[in-house]
Amino acid sequence: MGSTSQEILKSFCFNTDWDYAVFWQLNHRGSRMVLTLEDAYYDHHGTNMHGAHDPLGLAVAKMSYHVYSLGEGIVGQVAVSGEHQWVFPENYNNCNSAFEFHNVWESQISAGIKTILVVAVGPCGVVQLGSLCKVNEDVNFVNHIRHLFLALRDPLADHAANLRQCNMNNSLCLPKMPSEGLHAEAFPDCSGEVDKAMDVEESNILTQYKTRRSDSMPYNTPSSCLVMEKAAQVVGGREVVQGSTCGSYSGVTFGFPVDLVGAKHENQVGTNIIRDAPHVGMTSGCKDSRDLDPNLHLYMKNHVLNDTSTSALAIEAERLITSQSYPRLDSTFQATSRTDKESSYHNEVFQLSENQGNKYIKETERMLGRNCESSQFDALISSGYTFAGSELLEALGSAFKQTNTGQEELLKSEHGSTMRPTDDMSHSQLTFDPGPENLLDAVVANVCQRDGNARDDMMSSRSVQSLLTNMELAEPSGQKKHNIVNPINSAMNQPPMAEVDTQQNSSDICGAFSSIGFSSTYPSSSSDQFQTSLDIPKKNKKRAKPGESSRPRPRDRQLIQDRIKELRELVPNGSKCSIDSLLERTIKHMLFLQNVTKHAEKLSKSANEKMQQKETGMQGSSCAVEVGGHLQVSSIIVENLNKQGMVLIEMLCEECGHFLEIANVIRSLDLVILRGFTETQGEKTWICFVTESQNSKVMQRMDILWSLVQIFQPKANEKG
């Protein structure tokens, strides 16, 4: 974190009772996490001593050598628990922390430290503060420390922590004034300034909101706070919304996220903020909040100014407004489009401009026009009309066509005329934007795969009938009012062409098909081409490259790789060899280790037998030879130690460079070297080997002797 954390630590000791501040940072050391001293600040100006005569300065300097593991000492325990701890050494008698006081904090206590505060700052680490005087416990100061380090790591996370803390501390930042007094007349001629302020902050706030936004983001977002803060500064010098000590307007919940309200254009910052405003007691669309709904007004009057949980307030407000306002959406905005006085929404705190009101009207007109288009498209599909080039009805089969009986009454107006689509009416005019766009593909594909042939009307009709039955059971019973509007002229100022009350029947089920995303935009005109289009994604399926696998490695294979890695470390020279040679070397190594204990027992027995032979004067059979030249004489002795095939080979040489050559010769004779050593005797070297024949094979001593003579004979001839 660098110099920024140094400045934060310095701020803790500036004009306060704290004399030093230390930041312990979490770091990886091998396979474990440790706490090491990252930054420290010591206020040496408060003391008269300097340098080597300052015991507290030396104590702070010694802290840089300490390393805490997680759970070790008070610092490690605080890092694990995530809490804070106030330590007063004069009355602290916890035996579990005796090591901490006698070894780590002994120099600090001897320097006069009377209060130590240890605070966990999330994933950053731990902050430790010390004071020469006794400091009373203060939870607000602890929260202040955490907020500063959270802001240093992630400013947005610190803002969310501020919001939660404000809600917990009952610091609701709304002013305590009655809602009836918040009328637009209290702030005259300020709407233009508010609009300018919102437009200036729009681009910066949108950038911050889109880049820092996540699904778990709290409702009171920083972008809303910044806009309302700017607006509050402009409104005639009177700040209606006041900030709390936890942050800039952190206690005010400005409503729900844009996605929950259903807004499709996030660039309308002013519109979204004003739309969110009613959820905290500021109403829009009428002069008085009592005009909305008596239940909503009563709830706001009793709870808004007293409730300490802004999240509960927002949820309750959303429930009331959704249940009371949305059913009257058609009539409200139709009346709004016919009058000029009601075209702009009057807010009790901020009076919106006419442009922002028009944004509301256009957005609602677009949403209602989409619903009208979808209802008309449902009616056309239910009447059995087939578009030119469409294969929706062909794919669904004859069962879908049979549901058209008696449905043409839905298209009849009050004068008895039936509306039919014109030839020049395009598909896009009768198709709305679906939510799940590929639902039709999935339904038809399932029908085709289950039956094996999309053109089999009998099997297809059964699947469609079962699907229709399920939808009919899920659809609530009752009456519906269908507003049939011309999709070409779907403006809000035109009255609906027909309003027909119908019972819940198969036309509503057809409407359910259309509402969940069915559309007739396929360009092909036959069922064969439709089936071919469904098979195209199967052919374009990518194959994995050789050596690559999308599936995770099985656990047993991972264990095998780990064991091979351990073998490479244990077996000599096994780090760079192949797996086959590694296994071969491992087998030889294990066989050698298996015979170690057996060889040790044999060596001890042979040594005891040799001592007994020397005491009794008995000599074992031996064979000796001297290989000599002009300047060199070498003695070789081959002796049987016992009847188990153990052979003692002794040589006296003038050079010690023959040891490895002799060992290779012995191994070539299928003898196992149990023991081998050299010893210097004057100017010569004595070499001794204790060997054993493999597989109980009887080895003649002359064979061993002759093989060893071949080593010395050529060298003696060369020097001769």
UniProtKB/Swiss-Prot annotation:
Keywords: Developmental protein, DNA-binding, Nucleus, Transcription, Transcription regulation. Transmembrane segments: none annotated. A motif (Nuclear localization signal) lies at residues 540-547. Residues 522-534 have a biased composition (Polar residues). Pfam families: bHLH-MYC_N, bHLH_LHW. One of its GO terms (molecular function) is DNA binding. Transcription factor that may regulate root development. Homodimer. This is Transcription factor bHLH155. It comes from Arabidopsis thaliana. The lineage of its organism: Eukaryota, Viridiplantae, Streptophyta, Embryophyta, Tracheophyta. The gene is BHLH155.
